[in-house]
Amino acid sequence: MTCKIIGCGQYLPSKIVSNDELTKFVDTNDEWIRTRTGITQRHIADDTEYTSHLALKSAEKAIEDAGISANDIDLIIICTTTPDHSFPSVATKLQGYLGLTNIPSFDLQAVCAGFVYGLQVANSLIASSKYKTVLLIGAEKMTSLLDWNDRSTCVLFGDGAGSVILQRSSDDSGLIESNIFSSGIDYDILYTNGGISMNGTSGKIIMQGQKLFRHAIEKMQQSIEELLCANQFSVSDIDYFIPHQANVRIINKLAELLNIEEHKIIKTVEKHANCSAASIPLALSTLKGLGKIKKGDILLFSAIGAGLTWGSALIRW
């Protein structure tokens, strides 16, 4: 038994900040950002808009897209690294917003790989036959973790949320297989310099960009090749490749190494920037909204995040 995606939704804050606007308070320029990242703008939540609010707005759209009622949901998983509070979880707050009671809800923290991790966890719980309809969300307010004086990180991230509704599949559609990995010895490649038990703050993002670039390509390629081989798929079988939207150079290099045709690669990083766990469901929702996905299409997700955490998933639509 496997799960399938029956609905998608997304939400991006209304405030858009272009590269040119960033030059007003950080030493950078549009060409420098575009050539290194592919990013031209990012959405930024205001001070009164929290991760739970982003999650709610995307969830409502996914529920509508799936043609279900919120009352049909029997499990909520939110993948986030920017919760409203240390506790309770964003998922329980969202559950309250939706007026749901007596169902489990929890946050999952695997940073940019969170959605792939969440998909595997949700699928396992659906396969247990205990849960029928799962709301899985990637939601992030990454700009709350930025040092706006650090041009190596502040230009990279944005805010947003993407949601999917998952149900048990009764045919060959749905999650074919996924894999997830982590390597704790590499945690200092990307981390925040704060933490509740360490110094009582959330901290700001610290990143070793060149090391992360190398690890991202190596580990995502390995994950994808293992997944394809295990399921007797070739790259030519993939209809759409939806990678984590961290950096267009990573996406392009990975596609080159795997020989994935350009028209199959979904890129939203230009307009969304890096929305961490929200990036894949945002890209998926964007693609679905264009009406391009057909029944039977094979979708490949792949992501890497801090930890390091990484993984991939194959979906038959």
UniProtKB/Swiss-Prot annotation:
It is found in: Cytoplasm. HAMAP family: FabH (MF_01815). Homodimer. Pathway: Lipid metabolism; fatty acid biosynthesis. GO terms for biological process: fatty acid biosynthetic process. Belongs to the thiolase-like superfamily. FabH family. Its main location: cytoplasm. InterPro entries: ACP_syn_III_C, ACP_syn_III_N, FabH, Thiolase-like. It comes from the Bacteria. GO terms for molecular function: 3-oxoacyl-[acyl-carrier-protein] synthase activity; beta-ketoacyl-acyl-carrier-protein synthase III activity. The keyword Cytoplasm applies. This is Beta-ketoacyl-[acyl-carrier-protein] synthase III. It catalyses: malonyl-[ACP] + acetyl-CoA + H(+) = 3-oxobutanoyl-[ACP] + CO2 + CoA. It is an enzyme of class 2 (transferase). Catalyzes the condensation reaction of fatty acid synthesis by the addition to an acyl acceptor of two carbons from malonyl-ACP. Catalyzes the first condensation reaction which initiates fatty acid synthesis and may therefore play a role in governing the total rate of fatty acid production. Possesses both acetoacetyl-ACP synthase and acetyl transacylase activities. Its substrate specificity determines the biosynthesis of branched-chain and/or straight-chain of fatty acids. Keywords: Acyltransferase, Cytoplasm, Fatty acid biosynthesis, Fatty acid metabolism, Lipid biosynthesis, Lipid metabolism, Multifunctional enzyme, Transferase. Its EC number is 2.3.1.180. Residues 245-249 are annotated as: ACP-binding. Pfam families: ACP_syn_III, ACP_syn_III_C. GO terms for cellular component: cytoplasm. The last Arg residue of the ACP-binding site is essential for the weak association between ACP/AcpP and FabH. The active site is at C112, H244, N274.
